[in-house]
Amino acid sequence: MPFRIANVWEMTGDDKADIKFGKMPDKIQKKMLRTSLRKAGKLLQTAARGMVAKDSGALRASIKPKAAKRSRKNKHIIAVRVMTSSKAYKGEYFPGGHVEYGTQFQSANPFMRPAADQVRSQVIAYFKQDLKAAIAESGKGK
């Protein structure tokens, strides 16, 4: 399994929204979570793309958000990952990892961690707002 640069955050939600959300069918929960996570992940994607070196643009283009799967043990823990694509691998060479962490010949030029630190609170706030809006919208349809 290739190494991927990723930032995974865990957070807890609002109790009232959690109760409404828990009463919904699993399929609807999953769809709402993934949609809200992807939207929130785009904030981190934009920040990371802005901080990465612009040489060929391939590394910048490979940075994409992905909604991680929920844990079966605790369905209340969800995650969004923004990572470089596996298409960026070139044999033994992984440009994302080499740029972020450096090598023995190249100094590190971090872009993913600083981007995550910069927009963390915005991503969490946006996700909570978007998910609450989706829950409220689904309640109006009944």
Where are these regions (language model features)?
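Carboxylate-rich helix-loop segments that flank metal/cofactor sites and access channels
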Residues: 90-91
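Short, Lys/Arg-rich flexible segments
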Residues: 1-79, 83, 87, 96-142
